[in-house]
Amino acid sequence: MSEDSSALPWSINRDDYELQEVIGSGATAVVQAAYCAPKKEKVAIKRINLEKCQTSMDELLKEIQAMSQCHHPNIVSYYTSFVVKDELWLVMKLLSGGSVLDIIKHIVAKGEHKSGVLDESTIATILREVLEGLEYLHKNGQIHRDVKAGNILLGEDGSVQIADFGVSAFLATGGDITRNKVRKTFVGTPCWMAPEVMEQVRGYDFKADIWSFGITAIELATGAAPYHKYPPMKVLMLTLQNDPPSLETGVQDKEMLKKYGKSFRKMISLCLQKDPEKRPTAAELLRHKFFQKAKNKEFLQEKILQRAPTISERAKKVRRVPGSSGRLHKTEDGGWEWSDDEFDEESEEGKAAISQLRSPRVKESISNSELFPTTDPVGTLLQVPEQISAHLPQPAGQMPTQPTQVSLPPTAEPAKTAQALSSGSGSQETKIPISLVLRLRNSKKELNDIRFEFTPGRDTAEGVSQELISAGLVDGRDLVIVAANLQKIVEEPQSNRSVTFKLASGVEGSDIPDDGKLIGFAQLSIS
């Protein structure tokens, strides 16, 4: 009978899958173990909510078809996919060893990381397999875009496979994935994200995966990405403004890093070069001296799988076996339960979809579904509301010598604004707008004052910055840095009434950056 069941095609009938424990979750999806009765095999099902995606199913199916043609021992096998109500179910191979992140957390929880989380041989063995998978993807025109320990899975035999590519990224871009080799979509996890992906200026290619690979190497040694303690906006600012991170970045106890040698550190520094052209390819990295330390899968089986958490230890039990309807959501105590009610806006899943961080003044913003959640499809054009565009300054050629005063809608008194913000600003009830002025030079090198309002609980720093760029007031390269400093002010208005910061767009020709004269710099203040 086993031979007969293995010859059967994978079912696209929801009733043929018995959903079991939750084995992973993110902002937009839940992964559950499941038993496929016709195949007599346990699988993993990734359930992605399509309700807010508005992606063309024709385009989506084309991408799934391309993904299903990926066959490589270091890429998780996708068996089939189908739609259940407002969810896309991806059926894939279940790797019982879990993710490398599961193992990292397990080691740290047991206090066995004082001299580094994983040793060099283990890291080299895991990462060599990851490189094999990345080389395959890159040769086939695919960019993974979210390489990290949480997306590196282990089989019970010590095999290593990369998961979570293709459709996940496809959904996050609103269906705007083409077969071009350069992307401009903003997808990925901030701590692992390459600078060129953050900037959204030149576009990026497969070298973005190499940066993420370097961050992952640090994660396997230290237990976390370098800037993991910081909020997303701060991560973006640190990545763009600072020198590339190293093994030591953010690590307080340097003793834990003593056992890591020069070849490992050199490999990391090669990956973490801000200029993507200087980074090696996956094929070139495979020839690096560090990977001579790599061993076989039996080594991983013996070295880490025997002390890894079991699938039952990793799992989050579902409180009620679901029927054909209902929603899965996380409860306050971290458990999972099914609800037959309409979308629960108070659940974690609901919050992700409702997107509390979204700016209503921007109809559809280009964003990262994890970093800047929105309820609209991603990758569509921005539209500036009439009430704002009516107050925009004149074109650059008509700018006066003195800073242009751009008067936006009436503002609240600064004192009241600061008081409101310091006493619980972010609540939906407290919608007192904060008046701000952004002073920077235009393309004619003339100072320009841009006045606008920010309403806590309604606006987001990223959304407002997008409006300024859409209106032609701010260079697109400065999106992240303007948003980061706006966030800094609205979070702590009393201590940050005015900030001066360096622009990512830099200066032209022979100009010398000057923070006093705002050459290559900008100033953001509460007015």
UniProtKB/Swiss-Prot annotation:
Its cofactor is Mg(2+). The modification Phosphoserine is found at residues 324-325, 339, 347, 359, 427. The keyword Transmembrane helix does not apply. Residues 334-348 have a biased composition (Acidic residues). Activated following phosphorylation by WNK kinases (WNK1, WNK2, WNK3 or WNK4). Effector serine/threonine-protein kinase component of the WNK-SPAK/OSR1 kinase cascade, which is involved in various processes, such as ion transport, response to hypertonic stress and blood pressure. Specifically recognizes and binds proteins with a RFXV motif. Acts downstream of WNK kinases (WNK1, WNK2, WNK3 or WNK4): following activation by WNK kinases, catalyzes phosphorylation of ion cotransporters, such as SLC12A1/NKCC2, SLC12A2/NKCC1, SLC12A3/NCC, SLC12A5/KCC2 or SLC12A6/KCC3, regulating their activity. This is Serine/threonine-protein kinase OSR1.
